[in-house]
Regions:
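C-terminal motif of bacterial Sec signal peptides marking the signal peptidase cleavage site
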Residues: 25-28
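Thioredoxin-like thiol-disulfide oxidoreductase module
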Residues: 122-167
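Bacterial signal peptide processing site
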Residues: 30-33
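Post-signal peptide N-terminal segment of mature Sec-exported envelope proteins
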Residues: 39-58
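N-terminal secretory signal peptides that target proteins for export/translocation
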Residues: 1-12
Length: 194
């Protein structure tokens, strides 16, 4: 009888630890979505963040993290015949998340202008050199630091579309400055330009 009580109290303690661990994970995810993830960058990376209002074509691949606005992206799309924008999350490593470097290489191989735009600072400082400038959504105009919200608002401005922006569809294609569509895969976005 005493043995069963000891065993059940061990299970109770185990369940408490599992519940606490699960709660900690959920609350950290909640906090990351609610706080400005800029402060998760290392201090030396924070110094590399540069707000810019000029042409994207003038930016250099120099390890700086350039904050851009929707108008800069629209201007870039008007200046180039075929553009695919990749709305990427540097820390998002789930299945089917395309590496930003691979995206740039695939676009170059297909004669398409690549525009990878990060939607979060989380691990952005760990992205290896892309061959194009590292671009980040400047979220201040949207008066929110919640990445899901400012990402939707940013792409709504970029596309000039009243359609709902789905954050899981990470590729946006433009032909001669005209928004074609929002796609789940690079292949779908590329096909839309042909």
């Amino acid at each position: 009888m005493k043995r069963n009580q000891t065993q059940s109290s061990r299970f109770a303690i185990l369940h408490i630890f599992i519940a606490l661990g699960f709660s900690a994970i959920l609350s950290s995810c909640y906090i990351l979505n609610k706080t400005d993830d800029f402060y998760f960058l290392r201090p030396e990376a924070q110094k590399r963040v540069i707000p810019t209002t000029g042409s994207i074509d003038e930016l250099k691949d120099d390890r700086a993290i350039y904050l851009i606005n929707a108008q800069q992206v629209k201007d870039y799309c008007k200046q180039h015949s075929n553009v695919i924008i990749y709305n990427f999350s540097p820390s998002y490593t789930l299945y089917k998340n395309l590496n930003a470097n691979d995206f740039v290489d695939m676009c170059k191989a297909n004669g398409v202008n690549a525009l990878p735009i990060a939607n979060s600072y989380l691990e952005l400082d760990k992205v290896r050199k892309l061959g194009v400038p590292i671009l980040m959504i400047h979220h201040n105009p949207y008066k929110t630091n919640k990445w899901r919200r400012y990402t939707k608002l940013f792409y709504k401005d970029v596309t000039n579309s009243n359609k709902r922006i789905n954050n899981s569809k990470r590729f946006f294609s433009f032909k001669n400055g005209v928004y074609i569509g929002n796609f789940s895969t690079y292949e779908e976005a590329l096909k839309s330009l042909q």
